Amino acid sequence: MAATEPSGNPPAFERGGVLDMIERIGNKLPEPAILFAILAAIVVFFSAFGAWMGWQVQPVKLSYEMVPQVDASGQGVMGADGKALLVPKVGADGEKIRMLEPMGQPLKPRSLLTGEGIYWMFSSMLRNFTSMPALGLIFVAMLGIGLAEKFGFFGALMRALALATPKSILTPVIVLIGANSSVASDAGYIILPPLAAALYLAVGRHPIAGLAAAFAGVAGGFGGGFFPTGGDGVLAGFAQDAARVIDQTYSVGILHNLYFKAGSAIVVMLAGWLVTDWIVEPRLNRGKAAELAGVGGAGGASDEAAVIQSMALTAMEKKGLTYALATNVVVLGMFGLLILVPGAPLNGIGAPTLANGRVVAQQPVVISPGSAIATTPAEKILFKSEPVMNAAGEVTDPGLVVAMTGAKPTLLESPGDRWSHVIVPIIFLAFLVPGMAYGVVTGTLRSQKDFIEGLYHGIRSIVPVLAIAFFMAQFVNYFAYSGLDRMLAYAGGSLLVQADIPIPLLLVAFVFLVVLGDFAISGMLSKFGVLAPIFIPMFMMVGKSPELTTAAYRIGDSVVNIITPLNSYLLIILAVLQRYKKDAGLGSLISLMLPYSVVFFLIWTGFLLVWYYSGWPLGPDAPLHYGPKVG
């Protein structure tokens, strides 16, 4: 059964209800691209207004209150130099007691309405867009993912897993498949909910419960999953940009939340299982006879059997899936050898290099006044300069360090594990090769034209993202050029430190803020583009890593996906719902999914706090804490 558009006009919300109000307000909000254009204009205004008013903020650095280290007997521990060793003092809540020390000269906003500012806005427009870290990443990743989706690999894999699942564990498996379907673009929304509904009815369970479980997994579990996705790269890129407002050397990898995502997938599976079997399905069963009257004749069994039969894999599809999975194992195995074998190309530490052989640097370059750095033969970017200072704000070098007149430095990645610099090519090939294998075996890939069309399919899916990203890039870079990003980060971070709000409360409050934002701004990328430049630096000021802030964001972004009227996939799910409940409207769908949203919020946020107190890293090289290194 293909779910496309609802037949006829679906019933509206009950007039005057809260959901109707949310829908009306959401419909009046500007589209994400327009929203970022408006935000960019607001930054321009406040950059000029702040400069005129003489705003200034004192930069600070995070430090800890230090106390002498003592041994088990209570005696002070001495260092090799004979001096007492100091360690951070820990408060009653188990957190290190934070302090903020002044650093350097006060920051002042730089107006974008001066001659230099206006010139910069026009001259940097293209560079702002093309220098977005996430742009190339999501573009390349979606080439492989889109091709695999176009030739049917993802659809066949989900159908095979769902149809092979025993009745006793049908709910958790459906939810878990949904939570991992974000890697397959929108295939999870289109394939899994109608298939789950048919499977539930075929085994004598309420089909709407199957629909709800699948939708909860796909939408509500969007932030979880066992596999890296293009969306992870988008979040990493924006998190890194935001982090470098405070720390120019900070890097966020695409796998920054991998461990937490994997754990979250299990949590979402268990929570979805609980809600479906204990709350949603018992409620549905009370009105099952009336709702299903006339569906598929004889209780719907014959029609649903036909649906399941139509979704069963053909012999050719089974063969294609076997070959695709085998090639996936080969690709990942080859990369595993390249990473693990000593002396192999991806083994050890390294840094990216440019085409002309120069090593890509991250640390600022010390230059003399008036110097310029050539980025390409056709372009030279002039930089303003400032003294080289240490963390205490003292001048340590008579030379001058590069300081961008634009938004953010063009200096790229720091040295690290070689494999960490090739995550995107690994994702690209891990989906491209199996997708091609499946297409060749099943006959969906027959020619070069088919291959190119498969690549086009992935690019088409991100065209809206590119449009949003252009205006988002202007907003983010205007914010940075004006200096308002650093001023807001230092001011907000200082307030948080002075308020001494418990970190768990801060995390819960941030998750709730993202939940509220989901009713105003649709899309993971759009909301993160607004929130990351503000909250990631502020949380760093209280000693929490960008990776932790991103993990909290994933929860808030996911749990409301299943009930926000701004989710464009609601109409697809509604079409399936109306098959079993003729008078269903969006209000019916949202009331059906509300228990999932509430329970996911409570359990998933609790899981984040458990993870935080356990001290586990969120992913490879992804700590929970940020701060000065102390002994």
Label every PLM stretch briefly.
Residues 1-143, 148-150, 257-471, 595-601, ...:
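Hydrophobic transmembrane alpha-helices of multi-pass small-molecule transporters
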Residues 20-27, 127, 156-163, 197-202, ...:
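Short amphipathic alpha-helical coupling elements at transmembrane boundaries
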Residues 23-27, 193-288, 314-322, 552-554, ...:
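Membrane-core helix-loop-helix motifs of multi-pass transport proteins
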Residues 25-33, 125-132, 161-168, 180-183, ...:
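Loop-to-transmembrane-helix entry motif
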Residues 137-142, 166-197, 466-472, 498-537, ...:
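Hydrophobic alpha-helical transmembrane segments of multi-pass integral membrane proteins
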Residues 140-150, 168, 174-187, 217-225, ...:
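Helix-loop-helix module between adjacent transmembrane segments
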Residues 228-235, 347-348, 470-489, 611-619:
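Extracellular/periplasmic helix-exit of transmembrane alpha-helices
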Residues 480-505:
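Helix-loop-helix junctions that connect adjacent transmembrane helices in secondary transporters/permeases
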